């Protein structure tokens, strides 16, 4: 028996039947041809801008950049997130609230100091309202008047000079006024004539000082 002849005959007999459609399908039995056919498709899909980003225009920002820009806005920075801005907005009113309170305390302190200074000026009529500028001018004039009185006492032979002491005394302003009253009588202006009217409550201090300061 001829093996070659029988093999050729058997092989020829095997191919005499009509081939099945699945036997020549390139998807199952042709990986090389399948890769060759699909390679242009993948290359065009990767390199084509229209296929690569169908939802975004060509040359535009990446999806992550577009999402970030939509969330924060074109000019926003990551540090200016809405939550951070709300937190800063909640803290700012509390910081501003301390400003008016501090300014109010400062104004009250200044007003109290001027009120004490007005009380130190002697013979101020009860119906007279002094502004801060007039209070400072009268206080300056009164200090000059007291220094002139002390200078006259020093010329008379008194060895002690006036010294300003910043110590609190028990008597307070009343004792200070009592100490100043003898000095005020020594520097009285000349007696007024019968035709001149003397203003009540302004004795002990030259009347022209009041006339000059209150008329300004």
Curated annotation (Swiss-Prot):
Disulfide cysteine pairs (residue numbers): none
* Location of the bHLH domain: 94-146
Q: Which Pfam families does the record cross-reference, listed alphabetically?
A: HLH
Q: Where is this region: Disordered?
A: 1-20, 73-109, 165-203
Alphabetized GO MF terms: bHLH transcription factor binding; DNA binding; DNA-binding transcription activator activity, RNA polymerase II-specific; DNA-binding transcription factor activity, RNA polymerase II-specific; DNA-binding transcription repressor activity, RNA polymerase II-specific; enzyme binding; identical protein binding; protein homodimerization activity
User: Entry's SMART domains?
Assistant: HLH (SM00353)
Subcellular location field: Nucleus, Nucleoplasm; Nucleus, Nucleolus
The protein's UniProt keywords, in alphabetical order, are: Activator, Developmental protein, DNA-binding, Nucleus, Phosphoprotein, Transcription, Transcription regulation
Per UniProt, the ranges with Basic and acidic residues bias are 165-174
PTM details? Phosphorylation by PLK4 disrupts the interaction with MDFIC and leads to translocation into the nucleoplasm, allowing dimerization and transcription factor activity.
Composition bias of kind Basic residues appears in 8-18, 92-104
Oligomeric and partner information:
Efficient DNA binding requires dimerization with another bHLH protein. Forms homodimers and heterodimers with TCF3 gene products E12 and E47, HAND2 and HEY1, HEY2 and HEYL (hairy-related transcription factors). Interacts with MDFIC. Interacts with SOX15; the interaction enhances HAND1-induced differentiation of trophoblast giant cells.
Function text: Transcription factor that plays an essential role in both trophoblast giant cell differentiation and in cardiac morphogenesis. Binds the DNA sequence 5'-NRTCTG-3' (non-canonical E-box). Acts as a transcriptional repressor of SOX15. In the adult, could be required for ongoing expression of cardiac-specific genes.
Protein name (database record): Heart- and neural crest derivatives-expressed protein 1
Q: Name the species this protein comes from.
A: Rattus norvegicus (Rat)
